[in-house]
């Protein structure tokens, strides 16, 4: 009798666990809306911070860049940015250290930017892997007046990606406007430059984990 009760109790606990796991996991039902950054009207891109329906988090930022062009930013990242001192010029307070991985001269896609920087007052050690814009847009929106830079953002000290990001720099009168978009909570195990299937995905992309 006691054995039967234990079996029933054990089965019940397993059922509760599986149901809890099932209800906690959601697919990415909020689209990575990179196209939003390509709005034509100057100043129309909306800065915002908000939780999406699948519990991932969206951060959108608009930065005015007087006397700067999209091509200048392209050259800065593709060729000029080589040292931690250069990196600090971009943000003297928050940017601390940098290095490159898989970087080729005059190329940015396929390279990974290894950085230490403060984010909200806390030190973040990140691996920012720049990818071809087709991964986000399904096409390449780069042209003479637009520089598009997209990336998978991961932890530097562990083979795990945690976010997606996209910067769009567009020429406007008197300079450029940079539209930045970050999708936080896209978790994936990483091997080299490839994202791989792993239990990390199952746990990291659960609704509860994204919330907390």
Question: What are these language model-derived features?
Answer:
Residues 23, 27-107:
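Hydrophobic ligand-binding cavity/cleft-lining segments
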Residues 51-55, 141, 161, 170:
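A generic structural signal for short, solvent-exposed coil/turn residues
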């Amino acid at each position: 009798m006691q054995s039967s009760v234990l079996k029933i109790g054990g089965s019940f606990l397993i059922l509760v666990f599986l149901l809890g796991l099932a209800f906690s996991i959601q697919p990415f039902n909020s689209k990575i809306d990179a196209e939003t950054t390509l709005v034509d009207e100057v100043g129309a891109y909306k800065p915002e911070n908000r939780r999406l329906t699948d519990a991932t988090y969206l951060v959108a930022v608009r930065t005015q860049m007087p006397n700067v062009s999209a091509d200048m930013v392209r050259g800065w990242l593709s060729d000029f940015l080589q040292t931690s001192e250069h990196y600090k010029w971009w943000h003297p307070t928050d940017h601390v250290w940098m290095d490159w991985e898989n970087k080729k001269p005059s190329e940015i896609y396929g390279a990974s930017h290894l950085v230490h920087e403060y984010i909200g007052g806390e030190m973040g050690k990140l691996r920012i892997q720049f990818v071809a814009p087709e991964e986000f847009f399904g096409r390449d929106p780069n042209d003479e007046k637009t520089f598009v830079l997209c990336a998978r953002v991961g932890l530097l000290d562990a083979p795990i990606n945690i976010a997606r990001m996209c910067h769009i720099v567009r020429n406007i009168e008197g300079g450029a406007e940079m539209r930045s978009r970050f999708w936080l909570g896209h978790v994936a195990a990483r091997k080299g430059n490839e994202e791989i299937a792993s239990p990390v995905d199952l746990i990291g992309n659960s609704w509860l984990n994204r919330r907390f």
